[in-house]
C-alpha cells in the first residue's frame, strides 16, 4: 500500500477554508509562527456559530490585534459585535504583584488604538474599543449583553482572573473562553488564574498545543 503524506500544519478542513476570502485575509495577517493557534481560534468560533450559541465576542488584552483580527473578521462576517478591552498602554502597576512583580509597568505597550484599527482593516466596523484599566472599563452596557466567545490574553494573574470572573456570568451556556499563555511555562499568573477559576466554578481546561500554550474553557453550567 502506498503511503500518504499529509501537510501536518494544516487540518483537513483547510480544503474548505482555503476557498474562503475571509480565511485568506486572516492567513496574511496572523502570526505565521503560531498557525496552530489560528486554527484553534477559527475552528472553535466556527463550532460556536454552528451550534447557534447566543452572544457577541469580546477580548481582554488586545496588544497589536493578532487574535482580534481573527475575531473581528468572523464577527463581522456573521453580524456580531466585538468588544476589545485593553489599556493600550502596557501593564498597569496595579497588576504587578505576587508572581507578576518581576514585570515592569508599561511592558507590552506602545501600540495605539488607531494602529490596531488599521491592522484589523475593514472588519473594524464591528469593533468597539474600550481603552483603560479592566474591569473598570466594563460598564453596564457591556453587562446587559450575552457573549459566546471571550478571548483573554493579559499575561498576568490579576487581569486574567478579573476577565474570567466578570465574563463568566455573561457567557452563554456553551460559550468559549480562549485563554492565551496557560501552559507556556513562563506566565505563572496565567496558569494560576485559570486553575483558580476552574476550581471555583467546576469548569475544566482544554489545552491547545500552540506556541504559548493556550487553554480553552467551555461554559457547561
What do the PLM-derived regions correspond to, one by one?
Residues 1-5:
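N-terminal auxiliary segments of SAM/dcSAM-dependent transferases
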Residues 37-40:
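N-terminal pre-P-loop "Q-motif" helix
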Residues 7-35, 46, 51-221:
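S-adenosylmethionine/decaboxylated-SAM
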Amino acid at each position: 500500500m502506498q503511503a500518504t503524506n499529509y501537510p501536518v500544519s494544516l487540518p483537513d478542513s483547510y480544503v474548505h477554508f482555503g476557498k474562503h476570502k475571509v480565511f485568506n485575509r486572516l492567513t496574511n495577517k496572523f502570526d505565521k509562527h503560531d498557525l496552530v493557534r489560528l486554527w484553534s481560534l477559527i475552528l472553535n468560533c466556527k463550532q460556536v456559530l454552528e451550534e447557534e450559541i447566543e452572544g457577541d465576542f469580546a477580548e481582554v488584552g488586545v496588544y497589536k490585534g493578532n487574535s482580534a483580527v481573527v475575531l473581528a473578521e468572523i464577527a463581522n462576517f456573521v453580524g456580531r459585535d466585538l468588544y476589545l478591552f485593553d489599556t493600550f498602554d502596557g501593564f498597569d502597576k496595579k497588576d504587578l504583584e505576587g508572581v507578576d512583580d518581576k514585570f515592569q509597568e508599561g511592558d507590552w505597550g506602545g501600540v495605539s488604538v488607531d494602529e490596531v484599527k488599521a491592522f484589523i482593516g475593514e472588519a473594524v466596523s464591528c469593533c468597539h474599543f474600550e481603552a483603560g484599566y479592566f474591569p473598570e472599563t466594563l460598564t453596564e452596557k457591556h453587562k446587559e449583553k450575552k457573549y459566546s466567545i471571550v478571548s483573554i490574553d493579559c499575561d498576568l494573574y490579576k487581569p486574567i482572573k478579573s476577565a474570567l470572573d466578570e465574563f463568566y456570568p455573561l457567557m452563554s451556556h456553551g460559550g468559549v473562553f480562549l485563554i492565551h499563555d496557560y501552559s507556556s511555562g513562563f506566565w505563572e499568573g496565567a496558569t494560576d488564574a485559570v486553575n483558580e477559576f476552574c476550581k471555583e466554578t467546576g469548569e475544566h481546561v482544554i489545552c491547545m498545543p500552540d506556541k504559548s500554550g493556550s487553554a480553552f474553557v467551555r461554559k457547561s453550567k
